[in-house]
Amino acid sequence: MPPSPDAPEAGSSRDRGWRVVQAQFLQSAPSVEACPPGDRPEIAIAGRSNVGKSSLLNALVGQRGLARVSRTPGRTQLLNVFELTLAGPGGARRTLRCVDLPGYGFAAARREVRQGFAPMIEGYLAEREALRALVLLVDARRGELSDLDQQLLEFASDHQRPTLLVITKADKLGAAARGLVRRRLADSVGVAPRDVLLTSASTGLGLQGPDGLAADLAALCEPEPA
C-alpha cells in the first residue's frame, strides 16, 4: 500500500512538545448517526481486540479510568467518543475528539457481532466529515499487520483518510527487537521507520514530547486554511 500523502510531517505543531491538559468521555454511540455533532476535528483509533487502545488513551491523557480497559477481547462494540484539549508551544491549543472504534479480529466474538463491526467502522471512515485521520495500533509482540489491518488501511486510503501507524506495548520488547519491528512495519506500508511511532502505556514511551503521539494528534488537527 502506498504511504498516505497526508501523514503528519515535521512542522509547526511538532517543533516542540504538546500535552493533553483536559480530557473527558462524551458518549458511546451505536452508529455513526448517533455520534456527537461534527463540530470538532476527529481522530479514529483502531486496532485488533486487546491491542491496548484504552490503556494507551488513558496513559496519553493521564487518567487511569477515562477509557474502560476490558479483559474480554471483542467486548467494545460501540463508537466511544472522547474529547481532548492539547496545549502546545506559544500557548497554542487544540481541541479534538478521539473516536475509539470497535476492536476486530477476535475469533471468540459472536459471528453476528463481528459482522456488525465492519459496517460501523467502514461507515464511520467513509462518511464522517469531521474525521481528520485514522490511527492504527499494532501490538509490538505481533510485529506485523494482520489481514484485517491491511484491509482497514486500504479502505482508509481509498477514502483519502490520512493514516498514522502506532506500535503499542513496545516495552515488552528489547531495543533491538523494537527497531526490527518498527522497520518491518514501516516497510510494509512504504514509509520511513521514523514515521511509525513506538509507544508504551506502561512507561509513557512515545506519548509526549515533540515526536510523541500528542504532537502527532495536534499536527493532524491543525486548523484548516480559511
Predicted regions and their residues:
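Switch II of P-loop NTPase G domains
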Residues: 35, 75-81, 91-96, 102-132, ...
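Conserved C-terminal guanine-recognition region of P-loop GTPase G domains, centered on the G4
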Residues: 118-194
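Conserved G1/Walker A P-loop phosphate-binding module
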Residues: 2-108
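Canonical P-loop GTPase G-domain recognition
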Residues: 20-33, 172-226
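Helical mechanochemical/support elements of P-loop NTPase systems and associated helical scaffolds
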Residues: 39, 65, 78, 94, ...
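Alpha-helix termini
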Residues: 86-92, 128, 221-225
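Conserved nucleotide-binding/hydrolysis micro-motifs of P-loop NTPases
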Residues: 74-75, 103-105, 140-144, 170-174, ...
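Conserved amphipathic alpha-helical interaction elements at protein-protein interfaces in regulatory
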Residues: 62-66, 127, 158, 219, ...
